[in-house]
Swiss-Prot record:
InterPro entries: Hydgase_Ni_incorp_HypA/HybF_CS, HypA/HybF. GO terms for molecular function: nickel cation binding; zinc ion binding. Belongs to the HypA/HybF family. It comes from the Bacteria. The gene is hypA. Zn(2+) binds at C73, C76, C89, C92. Keywords: Metal-binding, Nickel, Zinc. This is Hydrogenase maturation factor HypA. NCBIfam families: hypA (TIGR00100). It comes from Albidiferax ferrireducens (strain ATCC BAA-621 / DSM 15236 / T118) (Rhodoferax ferrireducens). Involved in the maturation of [NiFe] hydrogenases. Required for nickel insertion into the metal center of the hydrogenase. Ni(2+) binds at H2. GO terms for biological process: protein maturation; protein modification process.
């Protein structure tokens, strides 16, 4: 389950921000996760709850926003939506696709006290 190490990385970012900006508690974390990232949102919530115990983010609500997958189709010369990494172009049926979006994961915003 790679979500555990990802959740630990998110907590590290939060703790670094808490030291830098002098806040004591995080109440909400907004996390953007790309549809093609391979991250399971339910597993991420579970792991986040586990790793944030006894931290500035203990009890924080994790809000996950899913970013759509996109790719550049070399045959169509168009940006197209993608539901899976090795899918085919919805316009021409081709497989010459370069993923351009939906693989990222980032902390978008923190609500703090």
């Amino acid at each position: 389950m790679h979500e555990m190490s990802l959740a630990e990385g998110v907590l590290q970012l939060i703790e670094d921000a808490a030291r830098k900006d002098h806040f004591a508690k995080v109440t909400t974390v907004w996390l953007e996760i790309g549809q093609l990232s391979g991250v399971e949102p339910e597993a991420m919530v579970f792991c986040f709850d586990a790793v944030t115990r006894d931290s500035v983010a203990q009890g924080a609500r994790l809000e996950i926003m899913t970013l759509p997958g996109t790719a550049w189709c070399m045959a169509c010369a168009e940006t197209v939506p993608m539901a899976e990494v090795f899918g085919q172009c919805p316009q021409c049926g081709g497989y010459q696709l370069q993923v351009t979006g939906g693989t990222e994961m980032r902390v978008k915003e923190l609500e703090v006290e």
